[in-house]
Protein backbone atom coordinates (compact mmCIF):
# COMPACT_ATOMS: atom_id res chain seq x y z
CA UNK A 1 0.00 0.00 0.00
CA UNK A 2 1.11 3.59 -0.61
CA UNK A 3 1.66 4.53 3.02
CA UNK A 4 4.38 6.79 4.39
CA UNK A 5 6.17 5.94 7.66
CA UNK A 6 4.61 9.02 9.28
CA UNK A 7 1.17 7.43 8.98
CA UNK A 8 2.21 4.41 11.05
CA UNK A 9 2.06 4.92 14.82
CA UNK A 10 1.69 3.01 18.12
CA UNK A 11 3.87 0.15 16.92
CA UNK A 12 3.89 -2.90 19.19
CA UNK A 13 5.66 -5.94 17.73
CA UNK A 14 6.51 -9.04 19.75
CA UNK A 15 8.34 -12.23 18.77
CA UNK A 16 6.78 -15.22 20.52
CA UNK A 17 9.70 -17.66 20.39
CA UNK A 18 7.78 -20.47 22.08
CA UNK A 19 5.24 -20.60 19.26
CA UNK A 20 7.26 -19.15 16.39
CA UNK A 21 4.94 -16.24 15.63
CA UNK A 22 5.42 -12.48 15.37
CA UNK A 23 2.46 -10.50 16.71
CA UNK A 24 2.34 -7.01 15.19
CA UNK A 25 -0.08 -4.30 16.28
CA UNK A 26 0.05 -0.72 15.03
CA UNK A 27 -2.13 2.08 13.69
CA UNK A 28 -2.36 3.62 10.25
CA UNK A 29 -3.97 7.06 10.29
CA UNK A 30 -5.19 6.23 13.77
CA UNK A 31 -6.93 2.99 12.78
CA UNK A 32 -5.71 -0.31 14.28
CA UNK A 33 -3.99 -3.07 12.32
CA UNK A 34 -3.07 -6.50 13.68
CA UNK A 35 -0.91 -9.09 11.91
CA UNK A 36 0.22 -12.60 12.87
CA UNK A 37 3.28 -13.77 10.91
CA UNK A 38 4.59 -17.36 10.96
CA UNK A 39 7.01 -19.53 9.01
CA UNK A 40 6.42 -23.18 8.17
CA UNK A 41 9.09 -25.36 9.84
CA UNK A 42 9.43 -27.83 6.95
CA UNK A 43 8.73 -25.72 3.86
CA UNK A 44 10.01 -22.41 2.47
CA UNK A 45 6.66 -20.85 3.33
CA UNK A 46 5.59 -17.78 5.27
CA UNK A 47 2.05 -16.85 6.33
CA UNK A 48 0.28 -13.71 7.53
CA UNK A 49 -3.12 -13.25 9.17
CA UNK A 50 -4.31 -9.65 8.84
CA UNK A 51 -7.14 -7.82 10.57
CA UNK A 52 -7.96 -4.17 9.91
CA UNK A 53 -10.89 -2.11 8.65
CA UNK A 54 -8.47 -0.31 6.30
CA UNK A 55 -8.40 -3.26 3.89
CA UNK A 56 -4.69 -2.73 3.29
CA UNK A 57 -3.26 -4.53 0.23
CA UNK A 58 -0.08 -6.61 0.37
CA UNK A 59 2.50 -6.14 -2.39
CA UNK A 60 5.09 -8.71 -3.51
CA UNK A 61 8.04 -6.88 -5.09
CA UNK A 62 10.89 -8.74 -6.78
CA UNK A 63 14.32 -7.09 -7.11
CA UNK A 64 17.33 -7.59 -9.32
CA UNK A 65 20.49 -8.56 -7.39
CA UNK A 66 23.06 -5.87 -6.67
CA UNK A 67 26.12 -8.12 -6.88
CA UNK A 68 27.59 -6.07 -4.05
CA UNK A 69 29.84 -7.32 -1.25
CA UNK A 70 27.53 -6.49 1.66
CA UNK A 71 24.02 -5.05 1.42
CA UNK A 72 20.40 -6.19 1.29
CA UNK A 73 21.09 -7.60 -2.23
CA UNK A 74 18.13 -5.69 -3.73
CA UNK A 75 18.53 -3.43 -6.77
CA UNK A 76 15.17 -1.77 -7.46
CA UNK A 77 16.45 0.31 -10.40
CA UNK A 78 16.82 -2.47 -13.01
CA UNK A 79 13.20 -3.40 -13.66
CA UNK A 80 13.82 -4.07 -17.35
CA UNK A 81 16.48 -6.73 -16.68
CA UNK A 82 14.12 -9.25 -15.10
CA UNK A 83 10.46 -10.22 -15.22
CA UNK A 84 7.73 -11.62 -12.99
CA UNK A 85 4.60 -13.23 -14.36
CA UNK A 86 1.62 -15.30 -13.31
CA UNK A 87 2.22 -18.86 -14.52
CA UNK A 88 -1.09 -20.32 -13.35
CA UNK A 89 -4.00 -19.31 -11.16
CA UNK A 90 -6.91 -20.86 -9.30
CA UNK A 91 -9.85 -19.62 -7.29
CA UNK A 92 -7.70 -18.62 -4.31
CA UNK A 93 -4.10 -19.09 -5.47
CA UNK A 94 -1.56 -18.09 -8.10
CA UNK A 95 1.86 -19.36 -9.13
CA UNK A 96 4.37 -16.61 -9.89
CA UNK A 97 7.65 -17.04 -11.74
CA UNK A 98 10.54 -14.62 -11.43
CA UNK A 99 13.18 -14.80 -14.17
CA UNK A 100 16.49 -12.95 -14.04
CA UNK A 101 19.22 -13.77 -16.52
CA UNK A 102 19.38 -17.60 -16.70
CA UNK A 103 17.72 -18.14 -13.32
CA UNK A 104 14.04 -18.68 -12.60
CA UNK A 105 12.28 -19.42 -9.33
CA UNK A 106 8.66 -19.68 -8.27
CA UNK A 107 6.41 -18.26 -5.58
CA UNK A 108 3.16 -20.03 -4.77
CA UNK A 109 0.64 -17.64 -3.19
CA UNK A 110 -2.62 -18.80 -1.59
CA UNK A 111 -5.18 -16.79 0.35
CA UNK A 112 -8.33 -17.04 2.41
CA UNK A 113 -10.97 -14.34 2.29
CA UNK A 114 -12.37 -12.08 -0.41
CA UNK A 115 -9.21 -10.98 -2.22
CA UNK A 116 -8.41 -9.56 -5.65
CA UNK A 117 -5.01 -10.64 -7.08
CA UNK A 118 -3.32 -8.48 -9.73
CA UNK A 119 -0.01 -7.66 -11.37
CA UNK A 120 0.64 -3.99 -10.59
CA UNK A 121 4.03 -3.70 -12.28
CA UNK A 122 6.58 -5.64 -14.29
CA UNK A 123 7.90 -7.13 -11.05
CA UNK A 124 5.13 -6.42 -8.57
CA UNK A 125 2.14 -8.55 -7.61
CA UNK A 126 -0.58 -7.37 -5.23
CA UNK A 127 -3.32 -8.90 -3.09
CA UNK A 128 -6.13 -6.45 -2.35
CA UNK A 129 -8.64 -7.57 0.31
CA UNK A 130 -12.33 -6.69 0.25
CA UNK A 131 -12.91 -7.76 3.86
CA UNK A 132 -11.46 -6.73 7.22
CA UNK A 133 -9.97 -10.14 8.07
CA UNK A 134 -8.00 -12.26 5.64
CA UNK A 135 -4.81 -14.29 5.37
CA UNK A 136 -2.29 -15.56 2.85
CA UNK A 137 0.68 -17.90 2.47
CA UNK A 138 3.65 -17.57 0.13
CA UNK A 139 6.07 -20.40 -0.68
CA UNK A 140 9.39 -20.21 -2.52
CA UNK A 141 10.52 -23.03 -4.80
CA UNK A 142 13.37 -23.31 -7.33
CA UNK A 143 11.02 -25.43 -9.49
CA UNK A 144 7.39 -25.21 -10.52
CA UNK A 145 6.06 -27.99 -8.30
CA UNK A 146 2.48 -26.75 -8.32
CA UNK A 147 0.57 -24.89 -5.63
CA UNK A 148 0.72 -26.39 -2.16
CA UNK A 149 -2.46 -25.06 -0.60
CA UNK A 150 -1.79 -24.53 3.09
CA UNK A 151 -3.78 -21.92 4.94
CA UNK A 152 -2.23 -19.49 7.39
CA UNK A 153 -3.71 -21.21 10.43
CA UNK A 154 -2.08 -24.48 9.37
CA UNK A 155 1.30 -22.77 9.02
CA UNK A 156 0.96 -21.13 12.44
CA UNK A 157 -0.05 -24.45 14.01
CA UNK A 158 2.91 -26.26 12.42
CA UNK A 159 5.26 -23.53 13.63
CA UNK A 160 3.88 -23.80 17.16
CA UNK A 161 4.27 -27.58 17.11
CA UNK A 162 7.86 -27.33 15.91
CA UNK A 163 8.99 -24.73 18.42
CA UNK A 164 7.27 -26.45 21.31
CA UNK A 165 9.30 -29.56 20.47
CA UNK A 166 12.47 -27.52 19.97
CA UNK A 167 12.35 -25.92 23.41
CA UNK A 168 11.25 -29.08 25.22
CA UNK A 169 13.78 -31.40 23.57
CA UNK A 170 16.98 -29.38 23.91
CA UNK A 171 18.94 -27.53 26.55
CA UNK A 172 18.66 -23.90 27.59
CA UNK A 173 20.62 -21.73 29.99
CA UNK A 174 19.17 -20.74 33.35
CA UNK A 175 20.78 -17.85 35.22
CA UNK A 176 17.94 -17.40 37.72
CA UNK A 177 20.22 -18.21 40.67
CA UNK A 178 22.83 -15.64 39.62
CA UNK A 179 23.20 -12.54 41.80
CA UNK A 180 24.83 -10.40 39.11
CA UNK A 181 22.27 -7.78 37.96
CA UNK A 182 23.21 -8.45 34.33
CA UNK A 183 22.23 -12.13 34.51
CA UNK A 184 18.62 -11.74 33.36
CA UNK A 185 19.56 -9.75 30.26
CA UNK A 186 22.40 -12.15 29.44
CA UNK A 187 20.01 -15.11 29.73
CA UNK A 188 17.53 -13.37 27.41
CA UNK A 189 20.22 -12.80 24.81
CA UNK A 190 21.53 -16.37 24.97
CA UNK A 191 18.05 -17.86 24.57
CA UNK A 192 17.26 -15.42 21.76
CA UNK A 193 20.49 -16.44 20.03
CA UNK A 194 19.40 -20.09 20.18
CA UNK A 195 16.21 -19.15 18.34
CA UNK A 196 18.01 -16.99 15.77
CA UNK A 197 20.63 -19.64 15.02
CA UNK A 198 17.96 -22.31 14.61
CA UNK A 199 16.04 -20.06 12.21
CA UNK A 200 18.97 -18.82 10.15
CA UNK A 201 21.79 -21.36 10.42
CA UNK A 202 20.24 -24.83 10.16
CA UNK A 203 19.69 -25.26 6.44
CA UNK A 204 20.92 -27.68 3.80
CA UNK A 205 24.14 -25.68 3.29
CA UNK A 206 26.46 -23.89 5.70
CA UNK A 207 25.11 -20.40 6.45
CA UNK A 208 26.66 -17.18 5.28
CA UNK A 209 28.16 -15.13 8.09
CA UNK A 210 25.10 -12.88 8.37
CA UNK A 211 22.58 -15.70 8.23
CA UNK A 212 19.43 -14.77 6.31
CA UNK A 213 19.10 -11.26 7.72
CA UNK A 214 21.61 -9.55 5.46
CA UNK A 215 23.78 -10.26 2.45
CA UNK A 216 27.52 -10.48 3.12
CA UNK A 217 30.50 -11.62 1.05
CA UNK A 218 28.31 -11.60 -2.09
CA UNK A 219 25.95 -14.08 -0.43
CA UNK A 220 28.63 -16.76 -0.18
CA UNK A 221 29.49 -18.71 2.95
CA UNK A 222 32.85 -19.32 4.59
CA UNK A 223 33.59 -22.80 5.84
CA UNK A 224 35.74 -21.61 8.73
CA UNK A 225 32.59 -20.08 10.23
CA UNK A 226 30.34 -23.16 10.27
CA UNK A 227 31.77 -24.22 13.65
CA UNK A 228 30.70 -20.94 15.26
CA UNK A 229 27.20 -21.17 13.85
CA UNK A 230 26.43 -24.85 14.26
CA UNK A 231 28.59 -26.65 16.84
CA UNK A 232 26.22 -25.40 19.53
CA UNK A 233 23.33 -27.40 18.03
CA UNK A 234 24.86 -30.71 19.09
CA UNK A 235 25.85 -29.35 22.51
CA UNK A 236 22.33 -28.08 23.20
CA UNK A 237 20.78 -31.40 22.21
CA UNK A 238 19.73 -30.38 18.69
CA UNK A 239 22.16 -32.56 16.77
CA UNK A 240 19.44 -33.13 14.16
CA UNK A 241 19.90 -29.51 13.04
CA UNK A 242 23.65 -29.97 12.62
CA UNK A 243 22.94 -33.20 10.72
CA UNK A 244 20.88 -31.24 8.18
CA UNK A 245 23.95 -29.38 6.96
CA UNK A 246 26.88 -31.79 7.08
CA UNK A 247 25.70 -33.89 4.08
CA UNK A 248 26.68 -30.86 1.97
CA UNK A 249 30.33 -31.79 2.59
CA UNK A 250 29.77 -35.15 0.91
CA UNK A 251 28.15 -33.48 -2.10
CA UNK A 252 31.27 -31.36 -2.75
CA UNK A 253 33.81 -34.08 -1.92
CA UNK A 254 34.98 -34.47 -5.56
CA UNK A 255 35.73 -30.74 -5.77
CA UNK A 256 37.63 -30.84 -2.47
CA UNK A 257 39.75 -33.70 -3.83
CA UNK A 258 40.51 -31.68 -6.96
CA UNK A 259 41.73 -28.75 -4.84
CA UNK A 260 44.03 -31.03 -2.86
CA UNK A 261 45.40 -32.63 -6.04
CA UNK A 262 46.01 -29.22 -7.62
CA UNK A 263 47.97 -28.11 -4.56
CA UNK A 264 49.99 -31.32 -4.34
CA UNK A 265 48.23 -32.93 -1.38
CA UNK A 266 46.58 -36.28 -0.82
CA UNK A 267 43.01 -36.39 0.48
CA UNK A 268 40.82 -33.30 0.44
CA UNK A 269 41.31 -29.56 0.83
CA UNK A 270 38.04 -27.92 1.75
CA UNK A 271 37.16 -24.71 -0.05
CA UNK A 272 37.29 -21.56 2.07
CA UNK A 273 34.74 -19.19 0.51
CA UNK A 274 32.11 -20.92 -1.59
CA UNK A 275 28.41 -21.43 -2.33
CA UNK A 276 26.03 -24.41 -2.65
CA UNK A 277 27.91 -25.62 -5.75
CA UNK A 278 31.17 -25.99 -3.80
CA UNK A 279 33.14 -23.98 -6.36
CA UNK A 280 35.88 -21.80 -4.85
CA UNK A 281 35.26 -18.06 -4.88
CA UNK A 282 38.01 -15.97 -6.53
CA UNK A 283 40.55 -14.79 -3.98
CA UNK A 284 44.22 -13.88 -3.70
CA UNK A 285 44.59 -15.85 -0.45
CA UNK A 286 41.47 -17.97 0.07
CA UNK A 287 42.76 -21.07 -1.68
CA UNK A 288 45.73 -21.28 0.67
CA UNK A 289 43.96 -20.77 4.01
CA UNK A 290 43.54 -23.83 6.21
CA UNK A 291 41.43 -22.64 9.14
CA UNK A 292 38.31 -24.26 7.63
CA UNK A 293 40.04 -27.64 7.34
CA UNK A 294 39.43 -29.26 10.78
CA UNK A 295 35.78 -28.30 11.21
CA UNK A 296 34.24 -31.36 9.53
CA UNK A 297 36.28 -33.60 11.88
CA UNK A 298 35.09 -31.75 14.97
CA UNK A 299 31.44 -31.52 13.87
CA UNK A 300 31.30 -35.18 12.85
CA UNK A 301 32.72 -36.05 16.27
CA UNK A 302 29.93 -34.04 17.92
CA UNK A 303 27.35 -36.01 15.95
CA UNK A 304 29.03 -39.26 16.95
CA UNK A 305 28.98 -38.30 20.63
CA UNK A 306 25.29 -37.46 20.33
CA UNK A 307 24.62 -40.73 18.48
CA UNK A 308 27.41 -43.19 19.33
CA UNK A 309 26.70 -45.78 16.67
CA UNK A 310 28.25 -47.23 13.55
CA UNK A 311 25.95 -45.34 11.21
CA UNK A 312 27.54 -41.98 12.02
CA UNK A 313 31.05 -43.41 11.64
CA UNK A 314 30.19 -44.99 8.30
CA UNK A 315 28.56 -41.80 7.02
CA UNK A 316 31.49 -39.49 7.77
CA UNK A 317 34.50 -41.84 7.76
CA UNK A 318 35.74 -40.95 4.27
CA UNK A 319 35.44 -37.20 4.86
CA UNK A 320 37.24 -37.38 8.20
CA UNK A 321 40.04 -39.66 6.96
CA UNK A 322 40.64 -37.72 3.75
CA UNK A 323 40.65 -34.44 5.66
Model-predicted segments: where are they?
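Helix-terminus loop motifs that line ligand-binding clefts
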Residues: 197, 201-224, 237-298, 304-319, ...
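Acidic/polar, glycine-enriched structural segments that form the non-catalytic walls/loops
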Residues: 1-220, 239, 249-257
